[in-house]
Design a protein with these regions (language model features):
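Negatively charged
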Residues: 1-186
Length: 186
């Protein structure tokens, strides 16, 4: 487990994790959460094939502008709640290859990622997701999201999903998929 490994090291500015063996890690919850002064975090060598819990893994990294998570194997993941919550300075984030087939919780995944101008979540498999409250809340630089392929049949709550997203012009939603009553409070 890497649960809260270096969490809340609020004055830490640099951290070299390039040699870390993460191949047997199943829990990365809040591993780097609250390391708000951290300016760079290179997780490009992380093996995440066994990780089930990504709750708050990178939450509160206020000054990190890029996270190389494009190679992450998320096929075992069930929880991505608050994974990138509060990453105010993040300008690029490639999650287009994330396997979300087993994920149940997407709450606050990108909340307050206020400098992201693009985010490709079109390939997310949401067929097992039950909750996505506040998922994109405060991502006020995003102009569009493509959610047209999302299956939300099991979703019970989507409250404030797009709250504060003032520039969001298109969410590419299939009205038939999103018109089931579980969209209350969006």
């Amino acid at each position: 487990s890497m649960r809260r490994m270096v969490a809340y090291c609020s004055s830490l500015q640099t951290l070299n994790v390039s040699g870390w063996d993460t191949s047997n890690v199943t829990d990365m919850s809040e591993a780097f959460a609250g390391c708000r002064m951290l300016e760079e975090l290179d997780v490009s060598s992380f093996d995440t094939a066994r990780v089930e819990n990504f709750f708050g893994t990178f939450s509160g990294l206020e000054f990190v502008t890029a996270l190389d998570v494009g190679h992450f194997d998320t096929s075992a993941a069930t929880n991505m709640d608050s994974m990138f919550d509060g990453n105010f300075s993040l300008t690029t984030l490639d999650v287009s290859g994330f396997n979300t087939a087993h994920v149940q919780n997407l709450n606050r995944m990108f909340t307050n990622c206020q400098n992201l101008t693009e985010l490709d979540v079109s390939g997310f498999d949401t067929s097992n997701v039950t909750t996505m409250d506040n998922m994109f809340e405060g991502c006020n630089m995003l102009a569009e999201l493509n959610l047209s392929g999302w299956n939300i049949e099991k979703v019970e709550s989507m409250r404030y999903m797009f709250s504060g997203d003032n520039h969001l012009e298109s969410i590419g939603v299939d009205p038939a998929a999103f018109g089931r009553g579980n969209t209350e409070g969006m």
